[in-house]
Amino acid sequence: MSLTITKDNIFPKGYRGRLTEGVTYDERNNTLLWVDIIQGEVHRVFLDNTNINTNTSSSSHETLKWDSSNESIGAICLTNDPNKLIICSKYGLAYGDFSSSTIEYFFKYPHTTNPDEKLRLRSNDGIIDPWGNLWIGVMNDFPIGAKEGIQPEGKLYRIGFSKESNKLTCDVMIENSLISNGLCFNNQGDEFYWTDSLTFKIWKYDYDKTTNKLTNKSVFIDLKQFYPDVEQPEPDGLVMTNNGEIYTCVFSTGTILHVDNQGKEIERIKIAAKRPTCVTIGSGIKNNEMFVTTGHLKLDDEKATIDAINLDGDLGGFLFKLKVDKDLNGQKKNIWGGKV
């Protein structure tokens, strides 16, 4: 039976963003977190608080927001303190603290020493690897993309750490990317999967932790083969299961593609939003809930009203929760290994 996500799956009710992304489940305190990239916001809700199912604002829904309109947030990562996150922002990594409602940079990307690159690039998707290092992609910022089109100026960084000295290291793992997006490691840590959205592919690499090298690049899936009638079937955020299956949001198609560990299609989940952006698995007694973020159709229009009440038409900007009757077996989020 094919799965469909409709307005009945909107969660939490009463909230709608412009470009929601980076959805993350933290089992330590049963919370769901996500970002609105353009708004420069991080959101958190406690899933065991029944107030989040109402149409009114609730103390269970918390927000961290940059003060500067120049800022954006591409991804968030968990730390050893459930109230503190790493926020992957316009210029680098910041700590976000829900206890103090603050955001503060602690690391700037190497490219920000170049004034032109500092202006042109921003964070997009990122993860913590099985050893506690942070992998984050950067790409052209919105004004640059709107004016020039997305250029192959992106990079994928790996931010490492020393527990003894508290010093951070930064390696460029991939260069000249377009839209660095959904990424993950298999459970063994020797295979790395990485999305470059405008190539319409998810790429697979072998990874050697000892040498920190990516080798043997190959195509894991080519979205053009799955969506031959779609001009730009862009793979976006993804989640991997413990047996190597991948769910990837396919931007502009209103679907989430589910493939096995060989890249063969298992199913397509339809969603009532043309622009699904990110998916995660978590929550539920049987690990049987999936959460999806989406982008509003008018996300580029600063004057557009983002209406959380009107449920007519495309439902982009809402988050959705899908509960199924089986264990989805999703990988758990890794924790940043550096000091906080």
Curated annotation (Swiss-Prot):
It comes from the Eukaryota. Coiled coil: none annotated. GO terms for molecular function: calcium ion binding; gluconolactonase activity. Pfam families: SGL. InterPro entries: 6-blade_b-propeller_TolB-like (IPR011042), SGL (IPR013658), SMP-30 (IPR005511). One of its GO terms (biological process) is negative regulation of cell growth. Involved in the cell growth regulation. PANTHER family: REGUCALCIN. Belongs to the SMP-30/CGR1 family. This is Cell growth-regulated gene 1 protein. It comes from Candida albicans (strain SC5314 / ATCC MYA-2876).
